[in-house]
Amino acid sequence: VPTATGLPFDDIRALFERLTQPDLEARGRAALRNANLLKPTGSLGELEDIALFLAGWQGVEKPQITRPIVALFAGNHGVHAQGISRWPMEITQTMVDMFMQSGAAINQLCALHGLGLKVFDLALDMPVHDFTEEPAMDEKGCAATIAFGMEAIAGGVDLVCLGEMGIGNTTAASAIYAALYGGDVEDWVGDGAGADDDQRARKVAAIKKGLALHASSLNDPLEILRCFGGREIAAMVGTIISARAERVPVVIDGFVVSSAAAVLHKIDPALLDHCLFAHVSAEQAHQKALGAMGQKALLNLGMRLGEGTGAALAAMLVKSAASTHSGMATFADIGLPEVTSLPADQES
């Protein structure tokens, strides 16, 4: 239990002490229903696992996804000044404008798959500080941004897909992973939005400089977030926390979104029990990060765009899992004997 110091992060840490849990009784009823559906048990593979996951978090035998959204957070990064990206920082605003005009990849996927889209522009004209020179955020600002992200599920949603946009944010994510998990910085750095060898080397150098500068803060995941993260990453931490409080499942997108999840996983792995990981990014270190969190992604399509595009595709799988489980006929419907109990190893 954290000591009460009156510091902004104490309010955030207090939320970790009151975690909602899945309804195991509802999950058990869903498992029994699954055993009675008109198919060989297990024949829908991971869709069956997802359906039981949803049943537990929704607390019902027949889960439904009717109000899914993509929550897309955009932020800018002071470390961009270190020459770590081929793209000017203004592209972040350009892409936010494009999200609003329905011209980006994520807009097409949301329209196709029936997903709402909420775009959050996080003070793009005031990038977080350059972490090679000072912490990206102060504690008050970081905590306030986490709290802002907690509002993303306001209005009632039943599935949240997280996405992001921010020139330079793969560098911030790589720094977070390196700070959380250690190892060679080079192993956490990839091409981002098309970095060449020189830019990749500058990413590595910037992260090493930041790790040395903030060495005294590396034993606290929230401090790591504060020192290296962007506002979009901090806000996504908040969304994951608030979704847990409301028992709303979360779909984690790729490399950058996973860095927000990693901060929480390092605090307590159970903080991610309501999360599904959408896909393995083509960003080289993403598989390594997933392994560090003990997570398996649903898809591996070689994608590395961000924007929540991988999460949007995975949401289609989640919706499919709910629809098949909840809508299919059962053995009893066609006059066959019901399965009335499950072996202990199949009850969950």
Functional labels for PLM-detected ranges:
Residues 2-348:
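N-terminal loops that bind phosphate or other acidic moieties
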